[in-house]
Amino acid sequence: MMKRTLLWTAGCAVIVMALACLPLKAQQAMTEGNASPAERPKGKSFAKPDDAAAAIYAAARRNDEAEMLAILGPDAKDIVVWNDDANEREQQRAQFAQKYERMHRLMREPDNTVALYVGAENWPFPIPIVEYKGAWYFDAALGRQEIRYRQIGRNEMEALEVCRALVDAEKEYYANAHAYTAKFISTNDVHDGLYWKSMNDGGKSPIGPYLAHAGVESDGGRAEPFHGYYYRILLEGSEGFAIVAYPAMYRSSGVMTFIMNPDGTAYENDLGEQTATIAKQISSAHSNDSWKKVE
């Protein structure tokens, strides 16, 4: 369960070459289809998939961004330089190289691409190796799509953790106020929401500012997404509540919308292109049959 300390931070930056393999409900919900036929490579070509894998490993081990860009192609700069923190990028590449050295293997996938798996946990490198006229290269376009799928999956998993944290926050608030609240941010010095600026005599609020500003208030105030999701609190009479989490950008930051009850039971639904509009209109946790329990 997410601890309060996690809610008081902005969270980790999105790492495009993250070393965590996520199960992706989001990918199943996508309708973009399978890999398209290989196109003329924009980066380096290799005689064998093994050579391509060895080349990307060597470049990562040296932290050679110019060589990585040469291997992946000029259009892959957003993949090679995925944030402004050079130290973080170097650290992630070193971890990838260590996993590669520990164990690596290549596997031909059903779509005829070749996937590179590294480490004892068999982490799949997101950029596939594809064939074009007898030569092999990394397809950065397909890799960029896979990276997006993984980030969506990561956001959805984090959204569920945030919902659990908000359930705990509501219960903490109730212990002091003897009532639940639908507000994320308190009004001035009145503790009528889950977040307030700490005062000498006011104690620490149940949630921190970053999550608080991801809350969509009933008055329509401006919100900022937290790890790609917005949140709402539904009050169920005077003795109950539910948490709603929906993606800030459908099919980009997330796919599924979630509703979580006070006991931690969660339900999910793909609300489609009108996700934001529909999610803002949800008024009860008593969902219809289109909502499926999250296992």
Residue ranges and their predicted role:
Residues M1-C12:
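Bacterial N-terminal signal peptides that target proteins for export
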Residues A175-M249, S253-M256, M260, D270:
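Extracellular/periplasmic head regions of type IV pilus-like filament subunits
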